[in-house]
UniProtKB/Swiss-Prot annotation:
PANTHER family: DIHYDROPYRIMIDINE DEHYDROGENASE [NADP(+)] (PTHR43073:SF2)
Binding site for NAD(+): E287
Xref: InterPro entries: DPD_II (IPR028261), FAD/NAD-bd_sf (IPR036188), FAD/NAD-binding_dom (IPR023753), Helical_ferredxn (IPR009051)
Protein name, as recorded: NAD-dependent dihydropyrimidine dehydrogenase subunit PreT homolog
Entry keyword set: NAD, Oxidoreductase
Entry similarity comment: Belongs to the NADH dehydrogenase family.
Gene Ontology molecular-function annotations: dihydropyrimidine dehydrogenase (NAD+) activity; iron-sulfur cluster binding; NADH dehydrogenase activity
Length: 413
């Protein structure tokens, strides 16, 4: 097996011929259960039908009308749990490869320089968004379509949030994200980077300048485990992924690594280590395979790279670089040693600087995305729901509509 490069996509895309061939497998269901299963309402049933009839522009328009991050979602969405699970073709042989068809169309859109988005009218007043991650980016597009003048305030030097700083380049190339953001900026969305709302800029200042404010602060901080405080060479998964991403994979890796966790972030860490040349990578999760949190796509690709995945064990003791695990249901014990230990045990947002916003367990209390302050809304990872990119897109769209409804009512009073 040839060596995988960190900057090269792990999964190859479709050629036009292969895309048409795959789309021709579609049963053209009238009720399109695949479309019903998409949280972002990207409508795969409709765009696959367009591919089937060689109407690639129509397919691109369908995707972009519903999902401003269509090219991103095509690469990182857990489609096997969503649209592909709903695919009727599964009852015959296997589901349509919806993700790669969506990727083919969004790549074709870029290659042929399609102009689907048009600049907004900016006649309904100004709205501010805090955070340029997937929820904030999608909300900005929906609000711009509705006629608002939108400014996004981003703490980091570049927009994208977790898409830029956390997801490895072999899953999501930076060029793809840059192209998505360029389209959004061309619509007239203003993105201000290096702006720390809650720090140098207060929420009160934004409220005074804008008709409404949408918070889409992501869960950019990795969690740790007290058990590992005295362990040697421990790193938080979020920090490791960001380090690798910023250096385009040009970082040193250990001879052996032990990852604690079984989600998509743990799989990304394990895959990154393997691709960068770490000979021995082991991932240990407390969940058993039947309830494994990682998507099937990520789990399978990580295993294919040669990562050892152990399920059903939880850490109970640490001594230097040695970790002892107990099985969650049985009496089994396991001790593993590695040069580096990486913790992928969850993430949280920094909400300390937003004391005026009510939050519990890192989730902001909202009603239809509206906080206790009627002019402040929240979406993305900091509201209840799945912590996936496609769900962030969904909440961004819905929060934008909620803001529009609120401002329309305010005008009619």
């Amino acid at each position: 097996m040839p060596q995988q490069n960190y900057l090269d996509e792990l999964t190859p895309g479709f050629t036009p011929l292969l895309a048409i061939k795959e789309a021709s497998r579609c049963l053209l269901c009238h009720d399109a259960p695949c479309s019903q299963a998409c949280p972002a309402q990207t409508d795969p049933g409709k765009f696959i039908r367009s591919i089937y009839f060689r109407n690639f522009k129509g397919a691109a328009e369908t995707i972009r009308e519903n999902n401003a991050l269509g090219a991103v979602c095509a690469r990182v969405c857990p489609t096997e749990k969503l649209c592909q699970r709903g695919c009727t073709r599964s009852g015959i042989d296997k589901p349509i490869d919806i993700a790669r068809l969506q990727r083919f169309i969004t790549d074709f859109e870029q290659q042929t320089a399609m102009q689907i988005y048009q600049p907004g009218s900016k006649t309904r007043g100004k709205v501010a968004i805090i955070g340029a991650g997937p929820a904030g980016l999608q909300a900005s597009v929906t609000l711009t379509h509705l006629g608002y003048d939108v400014t996004i305030y981003e703490k980091q030097p570049q927009p994208g949030g977790w898409l830029r700083h956390g997801i490895p380049a072999f899953r999501l190339p930076q060029s793809v994200l840059d192209q998505e953001i360029a389209r959004i900026v061309e619509m007239g969305v203003n993105i201000k980077c290096n702006c720390d709302v809650g720090g140098s800029l207060s929420l009160a200042q934004l409220k005074a300048e804008y008709r409404a404010v949408l918070m889409t602060v992501g869960m950019s901080c990795g969690s740790d485990l007290p058990l590992f405080e005295q362990a040697s060479h421990v790193e938080i998964a979020v920090d490791f992924l960001q380090r690798a991403r910023q250096a385009d994979g040009d970082i040193s890796v250990p001879r052996s690594a032990l990852i604690i966790g079984g989600g998509d972030v743990a799989m990304d860490v394990a895959s990154t280590l393997k691709i960068l040349g770490c000979p021995s990578v082991t991932c240990v999760a407390r969940e058993e395979l039947a309830e494994f949190p990682a998507s099937e796509k990520e789990f399978t690709s990580t295993q294919a790279l040669g990562v050892s995945i152990i399920d059903g064990f939880t850490p109970v003791a640490v001594s230097g670089n040695k970790v002892t695990f107990h099985h969650v249901r049985h009496s089994g014990e396991l001790t593993l040693e590695a040069e580096n230990i990486i913790l992928a045990v969850g993430q949280h947002a920094r909400l300390d600087n937003f004391a005026e916003i009510k939050a519990q367990h890192n989730i902001i209390d909202t009603h239809n995305y509206q906080t206790d302050d009627p002019a402040i809304f929240a979406a993305g990872d900091i509201v209840k729901g799945d912590k996936t990119v496609v769900y962030a897109v969904k909440t961004g769209k819905e929060a934008a509509q909620a803001i529009h409804h609120y401002l329309e009512e305010a005008c009619s009073c």
